[in-house]
Amino acid sequence: MTKKRHLHCAAQKVLNNGGCGGIDGVEVEEFRENYTKNMSALYRQLTEDRYEPQPVLRTYISKGNGEQRPLGIPVIKDRIAQQAVKQILEIHFEEIFCDCSYGFRPNRSTEDAIKKVEEYKEQGYNWVLDADVKSYFDTIDHEILMELIAEEVSDGWILDIIRSWLTIGVMTEQGKRRNNGGNSTRRRNFSTFSKYLPTSL
């Protein structure tokens, strides 16, 4: 599979998921209308080491208890790049993730998690712990996160681009920008992508 084919596979997943546009105002349908042009531009940016992510759009949704949950909406081209990297990393990380983990994993669903709970119940387990880490994604230590990823991923380009997404910051709907901090890093050419590419999907 070529790098370009891999990027197109990522694009189809992102576009099929729909969702709102980011700070550039480009919606999914608009991106589709100029698909060839947009994808060619993104591919060149990545392969020519010119890719720069844009700040995510900060918006809020109701949690149902009177509080609001912050969301960060990347622009579509950044979502596609993120999906492409995700598809590469998943190949390795799926082999080491805990079997009891079901959240945001391929070929695993809420129904699968419920089935596992039922199995535990039949084995005599009667207690359930309902826990949540408050503001987890807003407060996670990026340096610790990157150290953990680096234990499994040695490629500098992959690590650099993940760090750039973590530190690019957010833009509010009022046009105010807030940075997440972090150190700037040197990105490496997209050609290193090829060593991670699957032979099939």
Task: Name each model-derived stretch.
Residues 78:
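Short loop/hinge segments at the start of secondary-structure elements
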Residues 4, 8-11, 46-48, 67-68:
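Non-catalytic regulatory/linker segments of enzymes
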Residues 45-60, 64, 96-108, 112-201:
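Conserved polymerase palm-domain catalytic core
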Residues 85:
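Nucleotide/phosphate-binding loop and acidic/charged catalytic motifs
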Residues 1-36:
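Non-catalytic, polymerase-adjacent accessory regions of viral genome-replication enzymes
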Residues 62-65, 89-91:
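Residues forming anionic-ligand binding surfaces in small-molecule and nucleic-acid pockets
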Residues 20, 30-55:
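Amphipathic alpha-helical blocks
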Residues 70-75:
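Conserved phosphate-binding loops in nucleotide/dinucleotide-binding enzymes
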